[in-house]
Regions:
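Non-catalytic, solvent-exposed segments at the cell envelope interface
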Residues: 1-395
Length: 395
């Protein structure tokens, strides 16, 4: 669920708006839309020094504020329904966006997010950390990955729908029809443009696809991310100041960010950097995983995941196994759409015994002086992936 493709859309288009029609009043209004929250709950001293590369945690939150039953009943909780760790290389050639399965088990660090909550630490699922505030999610992701997080961006369900509607809808191509009454989702096969509500349902549906697990929908979320990147950076948006402003007004109203991204000028500076990355240099991939010992409904990071994170930490390109990045499927066939909107905390998620779901092609490393690296033993990494320039209707 998009949730997360917000990196290429929010940041790039913020730069376009500010540089193109950047009146002071416009900047002040858009900056005033943004909600801020601390980046971290603890001291900075135990974190690696910042380098020329950047790591941004994207959070799609399922705070239960929506009235529609199809998106889950309100229960006052707040969890990250989607998490993406986006790595921007120092050379400006690559963005590697790693999806982190929300049902990943790990030892969550103790956390006290001022104004949000505190947690004493312990074994738990990655997505539960957000219930104590974004800083606790940042701490949990750093614990899982060993990668420094420089910024975070959070968008909730209502914000996501507003963003898609402000874009004028999200063009997608579904190889197969989708019918999921639990998510109020009934979509035909083929090319179509989805409004915000259907795009969210598509991004969340579990029961209409695959084995009904949370893992099954990650490839579908890659499809939605790619579609958002393509639509938000299209001439239909960028060449129309009115549409661009509507999009950015909706987007900034939906954002919770750390103080380092709290102003349009901050987003514009980062957006200028993001806008120079070619679409073929943006790769979405799923964290390699395996079934958690003793709990097939949960997953843990695999040895290949450790290799992925090592490369992010030292800003090295990642070599992915297989043919070409693009279809985002678990078995090499094209994906059809995302998982559902029911309150799916993992009750019936059935993780496969080996979780690196699909083979994908080499991540683009154009312009990088480094040689793409694979796993710790030198083999290319096998996981689900697609490039941002994927033709969603191809094949």
């Amino acid at each position: 669920m998009l949730r997360p493709a917000r990196i290429a859309t929010v940041l790039t288009l913020a730069a376009v708006l500010v540089l193109g029609i950047g009146a002071v009043g416009t900047m002040r209004h858009l900056s005033g839309n943004i909600t801020t929250s601390p980046l971290r709950a603890g001291a900075e001293s135990n974190r690696d020094a910042a380098g020329g590369d950047l790591n941004i945690l994207l959070l799609g939150s399922d705070s239960r504020d929506l009235a529609e039953e199809s998106f889950g009943e309100a229960d006052g909780s707040r969890r990250s329904d989607a998490m993406v760790l986006a790595h921007l290389s120092a050379d400006g050639a690559r963005i590697d966006a790693v999806q982190l399965p929300r049902d990943t088990l790990l030892t969550l660090p103790a956390c006290d997010d001022t104004g949000e909550g505190s947690f004493s630490g312990g074994r738990g699922m990655l997505n539960s950390a957000l219930n104590y505030g974004p800083a606790c999610s940042v701490a949990a992701v750093e614990e899982l990955t060993g990668v420094r997080v420089d910024h975070f961006v959070e968008v909730d369900f209502e914000g996501f729908m507003a963003i898609i509607d402000a874009l004028g809808g999200l063009p997608v191509c579904l190889p197969d029809a989708l019918d999921d009454p639990a998510a109020d989702l009934d979509l035909p096969a083929g090319q179509q443009t989805l409004g915000g509500k259907d795009a969210l349902a598509l991004a969340r549906t579990r029961h209409a696809v695959g084995d009904g697990s949370d893992i099954a929908r990650l490839g579908h979320q890659q499809m939605v991310m790619s579609a958002v990147v393509q639509e938000a950076t299209s001439r239909q948006v960028i060449a129309r100041p009115d549409r661009l402003y509507s999009f950015l007004d909706a987007t900034t109203s939906a954002l919770t960010v750390d103080p380092g991204l709290s102003g349009i000028a901050d987003l514009a500076a980062l957006g200028s950097r993001v806008s120079r990355v070619p679409a073929e240099g943006i790769t979405f991939l799923t964290m390699p995983w395996e079934a958690a010992p003793g709990d097939p409904n949960r997953v843990v990071a695999s040895a290949e995941a450790a290799a992925v994170f090592e490369h992010l930490a030292v800003d090295e390109p990642i070599a992915l196994a297989g043919g070409s990045v693009g279809d985002g499927s678990r078995d090499g066939s094209a994906d059809d759409g995302l998982d559902d909107g029911a309150d799916d905390r993992g009750d019936d998620q059935r993780a496969d015994e080996k979780g690196s779901a699909a083979t994908a092609g080499p991540a683009s490393s154009a312009g990088s002086p480094a040689t793409p690296q694979g796993s710790s033993d030198g083999a290319p990494i096998t996981t689900e992936a697609r490039s941002a320039d994927t033709d969603l209707c191809a094949g």
